[in-house]
From Swiss-Prot:
InterPro entries: Adeno_PVIII
One term under GO cellular component: host cell nucleus
Propeptide span(s): 114-199
Protein name in the entry: Pre-hexon-linking protein VIII
Induction of its expression: Expressed in the late phase of the viral replicative cycle.
Similarity section: Belongs to the adenoviridae hexon-linking protein family.
Molecular function GO terms recorded: hexon binding
Domain of life: Viruses
Gene name per UniProt: L4
């Protein structure tokens, strides 16, 4: 008795860090057909678009989310436990687990000063920050704009806007993706665009418009040219099987079902109908 067909499983090549396909006898089950990772990710994107409707409806009826990120309390914007970036710990809450100052290729992180103590043991948020240049900085608005937007520097006991007093950290030195200062001295792009981890950016308002964008995480913006790790392989090349791929008109049959499909070699436009298989 012939064994039933199994999913088309991509094989990981540890020597080269690439994926290779496995041959299967799909004649055993005529309504089964597998796909490469290109089709898999396209189907996943369709599912995400479908879920956006319910996700948006849920957000608009929740009182704690139906407003701007700028109105959230600091406790609501804490980093998830699995993120690589950890904020500087509160010296009053307990022993330090990481340094308060993290040095990067772009200068020192704004780690923050010690909170002000109040009667009864309460504390206030840090009133100012230090860059390591002997001056104090503070932000006078609660927004997610990058440094030095809406930042003040203390000079001779007076708080003045950074953009007016320090051209080095002004228009030519700001970084649109980070709240950290960017120095203007020459450095390789791989260092200039390196990030410590996830950050909350953007306006973040929940509105019935697809033009509202909030950057909650940062990922590499350059295509991967080198090999991948076994973890990346397991996340990007899962076993995939599609049921009844021939249930529609064959003129809409997607080339992505073929393990040999390469988008660069496909000259015909792909319509939305090719993604509507059940």
């Amino acid at each position: 008795m012939e064994a039933p067909v199994t999913p088309y499983i991509w094989q990981y090549q540890p020597e080269t860090g690439t994926a290779a396909g496995a041959r299967q006898n799909y004649g055993a089950v005529i309504n089964w057909l597998s796909s490469d990772n290109n089709m898999y990710h396209r189907v996943q994107e369709v599912n995400r678009q479908r879920n956006k409707i319910d996700d948006f409806r849920e957000q608009t009826v929740r009182a704690d989310m139906a407003h701007s990120f700028n109105d959230w309390k600091p406790q609501q914007l804490s980093q998830p436990a699995s993120t690589a970036y950890l904020p500087a710990p509160n010296p009053i809450a307990g022993p330090r687990t990481i340094p308060d100052v993290i040095f990067t290729a772009e200068g020192e992180q704004l780690a923050g000063a010690s909170p002000s103590l109040l009667s009864g043991g309460a504390s206030l948020p840090p009133s100012s920050y230090r860059l390591g240049d002997g001056r104090e900085y503070r932000k006078f608005t609660r927004d997610a704009m990058p440094f030095p937007h809406n930042w003040l520097v203390k000079e001779n006991g007076v708080w003045v806007p950074v953009e007016e007093r320090d051209p080095l950290l002004s228009e030519e030195g700001r970084n649109a993706l980070s709240s950290y200062p960017t120095l203007t001295y020459a450095q390789p792009p791989i260092l200039r665009y390196r990030r410590l981890g996830q950050q909350l950016q953007g306006g973040g308002v929940v509105a019935p418009s697809s033009r509202v964008v909030s950057l909650l995480t940062e990922q590499p913006r350059m295509p991967r040219t080198e090999g991948m790790t076994p973890y990346q392989f397991s996340a990007e090349f899962p076993p995939v099987v599609y049921d009844h791929p021939f249930s529609r008109n064959l003129t809409l049959f997607p080339k992505e079902f073929s393990p040999l499909f390469d988008p660069k070699d496909q000259v015909l436009a792909t319509s939305l109908a090719t993604l509507q298989y059940r």
